Amino acid sequence: RMGLATRPAGSEIPVELFELFPVLKQMLYRRGGDLSGGQQQQLAIARALASGPQLLVLDEPTEGIQPSIIKDIGRVIRMLAGRGDMAILLCEQYYDFAEELADDFLVMERGEVIASGLGSEMQSKGIRQLVSI
C-alpha cells in the first residue's frame, strides 16, 4: 500500500528545504504557477522532501530545465544520496545526468528490462547507445 504523507496546515516549512533550494526562499510568497519551469521543478522536489520520505521518486527532473538548474538539482540529489537516509529512484532520459548520479541502473524497453548493473559500468556496457534516439 502506498500513500502520500502530509503535514498539518500551517506547519513550518523545514529550513533544510531552503538550504537545498535557496531560490525558493526568494519566491516564498509567489504562486507556484508564476515560477519558471526550473523553479517549479525545484518546488516539486522540495514538496516531496517536506514529509521526510524514505523513498524519493524523481521522474524526468531535467525535462525542459535550463542547464544551471539541472546542475542544482544534481547537486541536491548527490547530497541526499550521500546522507544515506532515503532511497532515490531516478527515471531519466538525459544520459549524462543519470550516469553521473547512478549507483545502480536499469534500462527498460517496452516494459522489459534490457540492461542493468552498477552506475560505474554504464559506459563499459554501452548504455548510451541503448538509450539513444
Give, region by region, the residue ranges found by the protein language model.
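Helical segment within the ABC ATPase nucleotide-binding domain
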Residues: 71-84
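ABC-type ATPase nucleotide-binding domains, specifically the catalytic core motifs of the NBD
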Residues: 1-12, 22-25, 117
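Catalytic Walker B motif of ABC-type/P-loop ATPase nucleotide-binding domains
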Residues: 56-60
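Hydrophobic anchor residue at the start of the ABC signature
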Residues: 45
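ABC ATPase signature
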Residues: 35, 48-49
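H-loop/switch region of ABC-family ATPase nucleotide-binding domains
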Residues: 90-93
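A short, proline-enriched helix->beta-strand linker immediately N-terminal to the Walker B motif
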Residues: 50-54
